[in-house]
């Protein structure tokens, strides 16, 4: 396997996180393209520095997003955005080194976040998550 830091994916992930995932400490997330994987169905992976290693190394949580170049690079721009959103969605609000599972990170929720992101880009805004939570809790 070959791993390369990807400045272009990093910029996209930073923009997405800044607009729709304010809990993500984007300076503690790095994006990589990988080449040479033998996996058949995986397009991307979210890796985390787990609690034990954080404690052993005396460092805070850190995430690495891996995009398998052979598959990811062939996708349309919109599909790439959805994959990046999907991987960012795995990062929990506590940003402690854990993961949200696929009960939460699913196609329906990815599509919703993608729509939110595209609306933010169109309107040059960020999402007010606190307002949205209050609104959801009232309904």
What are these regions (language model features)?
Residues 82-94:
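Active-site recognition of the HExxH zinc-binding catalytic motif
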Residues 1-78, 94-139:
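Metalloprotease/metallohydrolase-associated module, dominated by Zn2+-dependent proteases
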